[in-house]
């Protein structure tokens, strides 16, 4: 690995345990920080645009705390046609989302940013991932939610856990995008910042 002095320290701007676990797979040292950003869609905003805007806002929020760092942020918005499916935040909303999605195709728009707060260079991408949900009974939905309680996950499902059982098929360029941190794109961005992984 290159000498650490050649690039700023890495900061993962996320409180997600799963994003942290994904980033650990790259075997590079990093710290975490939780950005304070209000997560909501603007009227008429496309799902990918919402995810990208929020990921950028998170990067700039973390940059205020770390003015000399490579800051990694991400956000994810699920969409069923024109309907945006954010974090349900309650059992009732999660039941409603899963009923709506059963047997249907949902697109997860995973936005990724790498912001160099030393140089103000921002790299950003949205990586879509298509998910076909199984036909689920109301009973299956209730049992799943009782076991996993995915109330802070876009689309009410944790694909990194039992939520994988809700899914019939996943299509996309990076399977990690569904969990919330597209590693393939992140590696490309880190290489642009001259971070050597091996």
UniProtKB/Swiss-Prot annotation:
EC assignment: 3.6.1.-
Site (Important for substrate specificity): 18, 76, 160
Keyword Cytoplasm: yes
Keywords: Cytoplasm, Hydrolase, Nucleotide metabolism
Entry's localization field: Cytoplasm
CDD domains the record matches: Maf (cd00555)
GO biological process, one term: nucleotide metabolic process
Pfam families registered for this protein in UniProt: Maf
Main location: cytoplasm
GO molecular function, one term: nucleoside triphosphate diphosphatase activity
Active site: 75
Catalytic activity: N(7)-methyl-GTP + H2O = N(7)-methyl-GMP + diphosphate + H(+)
Cofactor: a divalent metal cation
Domain of life: Bacteria
Enzyme class: hydrolase
Chain segments annotated as coiled-coil in the UniProt record: none
Gene Ontology cellular-component annotations: cytoplasm
Family that this chain belongs to: Belongs to the Maf family. YceF subfamily.
Function: Nucleoside triphosphate pyrophosphatase that hydrolyzes 7-methyl-GTP (m(7)GTP). May have a dual role in cell division arrest and in preventing the incorporation of modified nucleotides into cellular nucleic acids.
Official protein name in the record: 7-methyl-GTP pyrophosphatase
Organism annotation: Nitrosomonas europaea (strain ATCC 19718 / CIP 103999 / KCTC 2705 / NBRC 14298)
